[in-house]
Amino acid sequence: MYKLVLVRHGESKWNKENLFTGWTDVKLSEKGVSEACEGGRILKEEGYSFDIAFSSMLVRANDTLNIILCELGQSYIDVEKSWRLNERHYGALQGLNKAETAEKYGEDKVLIWRRSYNVPPMPLDESDKRHPIHDSRYKNIPKSELPSTECLKDTVARVIPYWTDKIAKAILEGKRVIVAAHGNSLRALVKYLDNMSEEDILKLNIPTGIPLVYELDKNLKPVKHYYLGDEDKIKAAMESVANQGKKIDR
């Protein structure tokens, strides 16, 4: 039996402001730092330790991982970072307020942009400075692979090869693995692991900073999964994620 721990980064400053973030590199809020500390504390209390960690190229996930490993006294372990674990690219929506966008275009349309499986938001033009081709951290990635926008289907298409080539390989080698990433890159992975339908993945809400444990059989098929922590806090955190795209009250 293998165990895999997944953690969505703690609340970022743009999460706090209810903005579409995507590939924009935004730091953790004070609450996000506290969430990461709490996640690390819970993992330590439950006796978890790790041999290798995987994360994205974005600071909010990297800092969450660093805080957790510091809480565990394991800052020394190997960390592999990849753009394939980045958040879903939200195209021209990046930087816009989710609730105000819902007021302008309607909640249903924003829900489709946020959570549909195969409908991407409006793309960024390559001349836009927000486009990843202008970010030096991706200079070694072929331009043709860098997205202008993504739907969840696109995110799945880049996450799963990394799972197969890197993460699953490490697990099968007997390494204890933690992955610190993002709401949609983790949803992509969960969809694959649990063989979820496109309809069911629409309803999945992964809370920030709360460790999600998968117990896997010898073929890396899930036996069960569960969050670590207080059940009421977990439920409230999931509801908070679900409410982000709703219209603001006047």
Curated annotation (Swiss-Prot):
Residues annotated as catalytic: 9 (tele-phosphohistidine intermediate), 87 (proton donor/acceptor)
GO biological process, alphabetically ordered: gluconeogenesis; glycolytic process
UniProt superkingdom: Bacteria
GO molecular function terms listed in the Swiss-Prot or TrEMBL record: phosphoglycerate mutase activity
Catalytic activity: (2R)-2-phosphoglycerate = (2R)-3-phosphoglycerate
This protein's pathway: Carbohydrate degradation; glycolysis; pyruvate from D-glyceraldehyde 3-phosphate: step 3/5
Binding residue positions for substrate: 8-15, 21-22, 60, 87-90, 98, 114-115, 183-184
Keyword Cell cycle attached: no
EC number: 5.4.2.11
Function summary: Catalyzes the interconversion of 2-phosphoglycerate and 3-phosphoglycerate.
Protein name from the UniProt record: 2,3-bisphosphoglycerate-dependent phosphoglycerate mutase
Species of provenance: Borrelia recurrentis (strain A1)
Highest classification ranks of the organism: Bacteria, Pseudomonadati, Spirochaetota, Spirochaetia, Spirochaetales
Encoding gene per record: gpmA
